[in-house]
Amino acid sequence: MPQQGLAYPVPTLIYHITHLNNLQGILQRGGLLPYSQRPPTQQNVAYGHIQAHRAQVVVPVGPRGKLHDYVPFYFCPRSPMLYAIHTQQTDYQGDQRPILHLVSSAQKVAEARIPFVFTDRHAAVQYVCFFHKLEHLKALDWQAIQASYWANVREKKQAEFLVKDFFPWELVEEIGVIDKTIQAQVESILAQFPDLHHPPVRVRRSWYYKKRLCSASCEATF
């Protein structure tokens, strides 16, 4: 497993989570919008109070701006955010089943010359470090990012890759879903847009939580 300061996976996969109900709108717009441009009809799965704080966080490098000017991705599936959804800790009161993982890579974004930054931990904490060159991916704690048990490394596991203003749909390489029923629903929505890029839709059960093995304060389950 890559270690902090030594190596990082190439391609460096990035994962955006969204609700199934948002997929049609994403396809109609041809991509993902940042929170500041989010349509009021979009199904929100986030913490409201954290989003209010993120709206004020300044990005000090690269294209700058604020966090809400960027489309957020994690460097791993099965994130702490998904656990919060799974255990109904966010403003969204559904479960993880309709949550999709939209997968791309940091290299694809860079090759498309789309402005981006990334962080070494959760982007909204005070002591976060921001970067805007891929060579600095080695500064991230990849052992924490890839950890199955992350109660003690929660902030570093939530390192973010942030794409400025708009993320084009054609850069999505895969859609990961929890089961075949959701897979069929995603395929049905994609079929309504025959002229658009159709990434493979794959059942990735290991990207989702199976059951709670501990209290919400532990937040580390298989």
Swiss-Prot record:
Molecular-function annotations in GO: DNA binding; glycosyltransferase activity; nucleotidyltransferase activity
All copies of domain DarT, residue ranges? 12-209
Instruction: Name a Pfam family for this protein.
Output: DarT
- Detail which positions bind NAD(+): H16, I17, T18, G25, L33, R54
Record annotation: effect of changing H53A: Still toxic in E.coli, decreased DNA ADP-ribosylation activity
Summary of subunit composition and partner proteins: Interacts with cognate antitoxin DarG (via C-terminus); this heterodimeric complex neutralizes the toxic effect of DarT by preventing ssDNA binding to DarT and consequently inactivating the toxin by direct protein-protein interactions.
Q: From which residue to which does the signal peptide run?
A: none
Catalyzed reaction equations: a thymidine in DNA + NAD(+) = an N-(ADP-alpha-D-ribosyl)-thymidine in DNA + nicotinamide + H(+)
Q: What is known of its domains?
A: The NAD(+)-binding element stabilizes the ADP-ribosylating turn-turn (ARTT) loop which confers substrate specificity; both domains contribute to ssDNA-binding.
Q: Which domain of life is it from?
A: Bacteria
Q: What is its EC number?
A: 2.4.2.-
Q: Which residue spans does the record list as DNA-binding?
A: 47-53, 78-83, 148-151, 154-158
Record has Ligase as a keyword: no
Is Zinc tagged as a keyword? no
Outcome of mutating Y83A: Still toxic in E.coli, decreased DNA ADP-ribosylation activity
Q: Which gene encodes it?
A: darT
Provenance organism: Thermus aquaticus (strain ATCC BAA-2747 / Y51MC23)
Resulting phenotype, R78A? Still toxic in E.coli, decreased DNA ADP-ribosylation activity
UniProt-annotated stretches for the region NAD(+)-binding element: 38-56
The family this protein is said to belong to = Belongs to the DarT ADP-ribosyltransferase family.
Q: What is the lineage of its organism?
A: Bacteria, Thermotogati, Deinococcota, Deinococci, Thermales
Task: Explain what the record says happens when changing R154A.
Answer: Still toxic in E.coli, decreased DNA ADP-ribosylation activity
- State its role: Toxic component of the hybrid type II/IV toxin-antitoxin (TA) system DarTG, which plays a crucial role in controlling bacterial growth and bacteriophage infection. Its toxic effect is neutralized by cognate antitoxin DarG. In case of phage infection, DarT toxin ADP-ribosylates DNA, which inhibits both viral DNA and RNA synthesis and leads to abortive infection. ADP-ribosylates ssDNA on the second thymidine of the consensus sequence 5'-TNTC-3'; the protein does not auto-modify. Has no activity on dsDNA in vitro. This leads to a decrease in DNA replication.
Q: Where is this region: ADP-ribosylating turn-turn loop?
A: 119-160
* Name under which the protein is recorded: DNA ADP-ribosyl transferase
Q: Where is the active site?
A: R54 (proton acceptor), E160
